[in-house]
Every structure is written in C-alpha cells, then in structure tokens.
A protein has these predicted regions:
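Sec-dependent signal peptide recognition
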Residues: 2-9
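C-terminal motif of bacterial Sec signal peptides marking the signal peptidase cleavage site
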Residues: 15-18
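A short, amphipathic beta-strand motif
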Residues: 29-38
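Short amphipathic beta-strand segments in non-cytosolic proteins
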Residues: 49-71
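Short, surface-exposed beta-strand/beta-hairpin micro-motifs centered on an aromatic residue
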Residues: 75-84
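A short tyrosine-centered beta-strand micro-motif
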Residues: 88-94
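Structured interaction patches on ligand/partner-binding surfaces of diverse proteins
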Residues: 97-125
C-alpha cells in the first residue's frame, strides 16, 4: 500500500511539472510595451482623442500554442510587462475595434511577435495602436 502511494504521488508530481507554462520564477527576462488608443466617432472619420490606454487587457501566447497563456492589464500609463519568461518565441496581442465593418464581432486582434534570447533580456515592443 505504501509503495502504491509513493508511486501515485511521484506520477502526479511528474504530470504537474510537465504541464507548467513557460513562466519561470528564476528567470528575469520580460516583454514590455504600451497600448496607445485612438477614440473616433462612430463612422471613424473624426479623431476625438488619443491617449495611452489604462486597464487594457494584453495577452501572451507561449511558443506555438493556439490559445493565450496569460493575460495582464495595462497600468494607468498604458504600460504592460510580462515577467519571468524563459528563452523562446512569444506572441503578444490586444483587441481593437474593427474600422472596416467586416468583422462580425466588431473587434480585431493586433499581434506583435517577440523573441527572448537571454534569461535576463528585456524586450521592448513598439506601441500597440488600438481603436476605442
């Protein structure tokens, strides 16, 4: 009975550790950037305001995954930072209003790719431009 319990606990530990995301507590690499928003009228013909967007959701995809792995929110200055990342490729995205009126959901994803080559690297992305 004792051996079965030890084997079961070992298997559970192996399964849990093999399913871990690419976030790494010992790593200091990060991806940072800003989200810049433009607010237009309903027909998108007149720019009403623009600003760095606070409280905007920003998503990250680790490697070749098909769904986002983590989500954070921009700070009051529109800044975001994904921390504790391993070496590898990442896709960062945000959502913006569709200005072409061709997407049923009325929103489109804006993507930027990033590569971390060193465990202490800080990758600074260009600003995301979104329509509010």
């Amino acid at each position: 009975m004792k051996n079965k319990l030890i084997i079961a606990l070992t298997l559970i530990t192996l399964i849990i550790s093999s399913c871990s995301k690419e976030e790494c507590e010992g790593c200091r690499a990060s991806i940072t950037g800003k989200v810049h928003a433009k607010n237009y009228n309903a027909s998108f013909t007149q720019l009403l305001s623009e600003y760095y967007a606070p409280d905007e959701d920003v998503y990250i995809i680790y490697g070749d995954n098909n769904f986002y792995d983590d989500k954070i929110t921009t700070d009051p200055n529109g800044v975001f930072e994904f921390k504790h990342l391993r070496k590898g490729n990442y896709t960062i995205f945000v959502y913006s209003k569709d200005t072409t009126f061709t997407i049923a959901s009325c929103v489109e994803a804006k993507y930027l790719d990033a590569e971390i080559k060193d465990k202490e690297e800080v990758v600074e992305l260009p600003d995301f431009e979104i329509i509010k």
